[in-house]
Amino acid sequence: MQLQYVLTLLWIIFAQNVFSRPTISKVAPENIEFFGRVTSYQKPVKVPDPISMYQQFAGLAQQSNCFKTKINATIGDAQLLFSWGDDDKNQRMQIFRSKSLGIVTSWSGMNVTSLTSLLSAADLFLVDVDRKYFPRVKKGSKLYDGFQNAFKRAAPVLVKKIQYFQELYDEDRVSLTGLSFGAALADIALPYVKENLKRGHIHRVVVFGHPRIGNQEWADSLDTYAEGKFFYVVNGNDIVPHLPPREFGYQQPSGQIWINPSNSSNWKLYPGQENVHGANSIFGFSIKDHTGVYFRTEIGSFWGHCPATIGQD
């Protein structure tokens, strides 16, 4: 198992350095030209929501990484209602009630001290989506095998608890967030949760350090389900949003917000999939930028603020 993990990392590094990207010529605002996949040339715009909203999401994304959190703990305008997972085989999943975001589910990032957690993320091959969980996504949709398996273990608990807390608090808004591995799980959860809500709607999905997790068809499906409410935030030169490489068939969905330079207050939305003006305009190589300051709020994984703070960094 350790050998599998090491070989996976070496293969990713090899691909990032050896596979050259084809020359891109601007011919349309959104041009299908990268191995038949979408590349956006749209100019960046201002982020569409108040900064306070992104800060609240960042705080909850950080909080799910904290080992010791008591039920009813308060993070910004949110109260912790439920926690599940051991952060080993199962990523920690926490559910909050937020005054501004509704019922929010947050997943922790990868536990780098756990071999089981590392190997869950190391299973990088694209496989067909499980139609039991995703019956209406686009034909041909594929997902990163390790992430899909991790989500399937959490799915029954997730929907049951969201439905319960919606009824308990008479709340129609449902939001999702997470860092890294947790960001991938929030992405995968969006279609599943939307299909299984008995009331209400997806309010927002805002994730941080989001890796590529599926192919073009999955990215298209996510865009359809999200209806413009999914955003993934890239901090500076963070390497993770560049992995796995597009050369392996992977594709990011729409909704990139790029903070550049890292940890700064300079952020913009880069519309469309794989926008050439956003994080793809540089060679992302930094591991340090993966955990950093997002919207003046630290997301430091297990080494960050616990309890999380909001807008204080």
Swiss-Prot record:
GO terms for biological process: lipid catabolic process. It comes from the Eukaryota. One of its GO terms (cellular component) is extracellular region. It is an enzyme of class 3 (hydrolase). Keywords: Cell wall, Disulfide bond, Glycoprotein, Hydrolase, Lipid degradation, Lipid metabolism, Secreted, Signal, Virulence. One of its GO terms (molecular function) is hydrolase activity. Glycans are attached at residues 72, 111, 263. Its main location: secreted. The active site is at 180 (nucleophile), 238, 290. Its EC number is 3.1.1.-. It catalyses: a monoacylglycerol + H2O = glycerol + a fatty acid + H(+); a diacylglycerol + H2O = a monoacylglycerol + a fatty acid + H(+). Residues 1-20 form the signal peptide. SUPFAM superfamilies: alpha/beta-Hydrolases. Disulfide bonds join 66-306. It is found in: Secreted; Secreted, Cell wall. InterPro entries: AB_hydrolase_fold, Fungal_lipase-type, Sec_MonoDiacylglyc_Lipase. Belongs to the AB hydrolase superfamily. Lipase family. Class 3 subfamily. Secreted lipase involved in Dandruff and seborrheic dermatitis (D/SD) probably via lipase-mediated breakdown of sebaceous lipids and release of irritating free fatty acids. Shows activity against monoglyceride and diglyceride substrates, but not triglyceride substrates and does not exhibit regio-selective production of diacylglycerols. Cleaves oleic acid from 1,2 isomers of diolein on both the 1 and the 2 position of the glycerol backbone, resulting mainly in free fatty acids but no monoolein is detected. This is Secreted mono- and diacylglycerol lipase MDL5. It comes from Malassezia globosa (strain ATCC MYA-4612 / CBS 7966) (Dandruff-associated fungus). The lineage of its organism: Eukaryota, Fungi, Dikarya, Basidiomycota, Ustilaginomycotina. The gene is MDL5.
